[in-house]
Amino acid sequence: MSAVTSLSESAVPAGSGESALGDLSNPASASRRAKDRTATIAMHSAFVLALVPLVWILWTVISHGYRMLLTSQWWMNSQRGVTVRDFGGGAYHAIIGTLLQAGVTAVISVPIGILTAIYLVEYGRGVAARAVSFMVDVLTGIPSIVAALTVYALWISTFGLSRVGFAVSLALVLLMVPTIVRSTEEMLKLVPNELREASYALGVPKWKTIMRIVLPTAFSGILTGVLLGLARVMGETAPLLILGPYTKSINFDLFSGNMASLPTMINQDRTEFLDAAVQRTWGAALTLILVVMLLNLAGRLIARFGKV
């Protein structure tokens, strides 16, 4: 019995409780806690610093432009017949132009982007896949003005066509496609390979597996990427200023005549230092922010509640 007692006493380190308490109060532990607090404070400070300019911009635009948005005239009328000195008029023509250009951009970009992502994930191997991936990376990093000048050189200088709404959409396509490709590519990679293998085991062809299994599984993530890409291109200004001359009238034809948009409306009225033009500038800016925010919110909600 005494032997067992001596063994148990020897198994328990002397002063183990004191050493545990000592670890909490020794300089090394205190230094770690201090570093942790410092890192936490630094992260919160960085968040606040990033939030301050955003809140300031939103507050400035909202406080100056909300009055215009409270009138039905703003949503139902254009600026036709309204001079820079006149109060009134609306942004209906610019909203229609923005939505039309963005819609055509999406119609062209979504199939190209999704098919490219499918190729890279499901079929792409070797040099060809690496070349396509490299070109997508290049397009991701190009400034919007480069895309606008590229379309200008081909559409206007080479083919002699006019500056119309469709030319704007082509420039926006160059900016939207890489966003869709990368977001869709990541969503397709998240689809478990077990689903593909089970489909192949049942004798389903690869193309039908992609159409019936892979794409429906990743649909919510793909749609989120499309909406976020669309929100990005709707806020671009360089293609609109270079390729889309402004008009105060409503134009539904993307292939003929000038077409207004919210960015070009802002640019048109900002050059005037009259109260009426300044109010319209703030109103158009707030309208554009609301449209982009709604698209971003829709994308976030789909990403949160959808299934991948």
Regions found by a protein language model. Name each.
Residues 137-175:
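Generic hydrophobic transmembrane alpha-helix motif, especially the helices
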Residues 82-83, 240-289:
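Interhelical loop and adjacent transmembrane-helix boundary motif
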Residues 185-189, 200, 224-227, 267-308:
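C-terminal transmembrane helix and the adjacent membrane-cytosol boundary/short C-terminal tail
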Residues 44, 94, 98, 134-137, ...:
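Residue-level signal for discrete positions within transmembrane alpha-helices
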Residues 106-110, 114-126, 130, 162-214, ...:
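Membrane-cytosol interface at the C-terminal ends of specific transmembrane alpha-helices
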Residues 22-45, 59-105, 125, 265-279:
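Periplasmic/extracellular loop-to-transmembrane helix junction in inner-membrane transport proteins
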